Amino acid sequence: MKNFHLLEQFIPNAAVQRVNSLLKSHPVNIRITGRRASKYGDFRALPDEHFHAITINHDLNPYSFLITFLHELAHLLTWKNHQNNVSPHGKEWKMHFKHLMHPFIEEHIFPDDVKHALLHYMSDPAASSCSSPSLIKSLRNHDKRKKGILLDELAAGSTFRMVDNKNFLFRKGEKARKRYKCFDLNSRREYWVSGLAEIVPVQETLGI
């Protein structure tokens, strides 16, 4: 893997040796990308090229970056064994992801709060770590620069904009399971927004 030295900058120091060993066993091209609101990373099977490819967002903290890398590397191993004949996040992928993650958890690579949430998430890993509120919140504790707050943290009735889409001006409403009914003051329409969405509070200016 020709760009491992670039990858070293983004992962915890304690993980460098093991990640290097994984990449020697499973060569893949890794490309660091800009922020993508819809995903942290992805795996691309490129059978006509020498290496397959993994892309990972540049703005993740080291622990989020490492989890994303292992998530995508599990896709590589699943593809090598099954190509497109199994579900992307089915039992085969879960098996590889658990196997890859286990030594990093055992070697205390992650802080205690992240490790605790990660152990719960890894009991049955989902397609995205965003599906685990406790994991998302623990990982945010280690962000150097937070772009906003979580919708869960905003008081009911407050107004806000999304971090990645400033076109809407929402008022936070009632909660149903993991989402809030939010009213867009511009379009006068209602939307259901995840409590884990990153938002920026907005102070309303009231006319007299």
Predicted regions and their residues:
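Metalloprotease/metallohydrolase-associated module, dominated by Zn2+-dependent proteases
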Residues: 2-48, 53, 59-62, 82-208
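Active-site recognition of the HExxH zinc-binding catalytic motif
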Residues: 67-80
